[in-house]
């Protein structure tokens, strides 16, 4: 049992560190809403995928490869299966659209925090993400990057909620097709790390949520993709060895706790949390990641829990529905990229997901980058993922 607990602690610490995608921009920047502040939006909500408002994005928040850039407010569905709104950034290529229009890629962002001040479309992009998104613009794709419902809009962003994130991603694609842009019906999904998980889940929902919309979903690119986190998280508790854990791991755990507690109040998550655990889960609702990392200090994983997470009735089913990733039922090809030097998402995590998908006869390919770490895989994978998208778009 002691060995298993040590393994659970190690896996939890490593896997929760996997959930970051965007490199820190640096000093905390006040959000710029580009004239579209939807934090307290209380107007009517139309059908999912409909655009409510669209404005030019402040050029300071654009990426260097964009021709035009917009910030949009659109309708979607939240973690409670209720109508909700989300915002997104939209970037168009500098080149003229081809016959039939530009295809679209939906970008699933990584961990920034749950507070409105963390909203990606209201902040400058990191250098890495600027390079990555510019690459796809240079390839002739329109890029739409959702913020996810609750981030810069009413409600709490449901962190790692597979279905809620999928709705935000897929509905952003439906929304961009309501803009006055020359678009092809073909579209794909791209994402890294926590956003890679969101991308794969969005791929499962893609055709299901766009049936009858005239769209043509073609495939997904996901790098550094965590999988099966729900199984590891269920083993968290006070009996984990009191090892020093990077603050980021505690921050990600706190984000999970805050989101799970909000989505499933019937579980009584607070019953297995210490006062310190409740304090950090509360703080996670508003603090962006750099600030939450500072608040964490020297807290360890076992400091958060007064009882095992697995002792909560119904927790396994709730975790599976909340953050589980389907391993069958995908309609289009899947690209998984993984760096062997990745210390955030262990290669075994992506390899396990690949094996699960392969066992279920899904169309999936795994690309390994021996000399790349977690973040480096994003850029290193571009030649392979570019060829992948060219192939599936042409199919």
Feature roles, as predicted:
Residues 26-97:
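Catalytic-loop region of hydrolases
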Residues 34-37, 43, 59, 223-325:
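Accessory cap/linker subdomain of secreted extracellular hydrolases
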Residues 79-87, 91-139, 152:
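Short, surface-exposed "cap/lid" segments of acyl-processing enzymes
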Residues 174-246:
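Primarily recognizes the serine-hydrolase "nucleophile elbow" in alpha/beta-hydrolase
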Residues 202, 332-334, 346-356:
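Short alpha-helix in the alpha/beta-hydrolase fold that links the catalytic acid
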Residues 308-318, 344, 351-395:
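C-terminal catalytic histidine-bearing segment of alpha/beta-hydrolase fold enzymes
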Residues 330, 335-342:
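Short beta-strand/loop motif that positions the catalytic acidic residue
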């Amino acid at each position: 049992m002691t060995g298993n607990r040590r393994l659970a602690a190690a896996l939890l610490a490593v896997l929760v560190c996997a959930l970051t995608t965007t490199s820190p921009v640096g000093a905390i920047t006040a959000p710029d809403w580009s004239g579209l502040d939807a934090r307290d939006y209380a107007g009517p909500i139309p059908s999912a995928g409909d655009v409510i408002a669209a404005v030019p994005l402040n050029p300071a928040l654009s990426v260097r490869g964009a021709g035009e850039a917009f910030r949009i407010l659109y309708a979607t569905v939240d973690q409670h299966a209720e109508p909700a709104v989300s915002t997104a950034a939209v970037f168009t290529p500098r080149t003229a659209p081809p016959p039939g229009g530009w295809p679209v890629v939906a970008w699933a962002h990584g961990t920034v925090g749950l507070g409105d001040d963390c909203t990606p479309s209201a902040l400058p992009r990191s250098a890495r993400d600027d390079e990555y998104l510019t690459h796809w613009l240079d390839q002739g794709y329109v890029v739409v990057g959702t913020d996810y419902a609750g981030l810069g809009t009413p409600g709490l962003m449901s962190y790692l909620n597979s279905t809620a994130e999928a709705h935000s991603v897929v509905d952003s694609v439906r929304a961009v097709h309501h803009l006055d842009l020359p678009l092809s019906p073909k579209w794909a999904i791209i994402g890294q790390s926590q956003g890679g998980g969101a991308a794969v889940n969005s791929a499962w929902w893609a055709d299901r949520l766009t049936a009858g919309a005239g769209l043509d979903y073609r495939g997904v690119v996901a790098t550094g993709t965590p999988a099966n986190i729900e199984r590891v998280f269920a083993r968290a508790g006070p009996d984990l060895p009191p090892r020093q854990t990077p603050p980021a791991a505690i921050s990600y755990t706190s984000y999970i706790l805050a989101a799970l507690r909000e989505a499933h109040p019937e579980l009584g998550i607070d019953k297995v949390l210490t006062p310190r655990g409740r304090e950090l889960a509360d703080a996670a609702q508003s603090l962006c990641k750099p600030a939450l990392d500072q608040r964490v200090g020297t807290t360890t994983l076992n400091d958060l829990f007064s009882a095992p997470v697995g002792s909560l009735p119904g927790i396994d089913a709730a975790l599976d529905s909340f953050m589980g990733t389907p391993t069958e039922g995908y309609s289009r090809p899947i690209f998984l990229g993984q760096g062997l030097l990745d210390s955030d998402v262990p290669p075994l995590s992506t390899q396990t997901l690949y094996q699960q998908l392969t066992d279920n006869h899904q169309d999936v390919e795994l690309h390994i980058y021996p000399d790349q770490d977690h973040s480096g895989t994003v850029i290193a994978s571009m030649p392979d993922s570019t060829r992948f998208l060219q192939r599936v778009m042409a199919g």
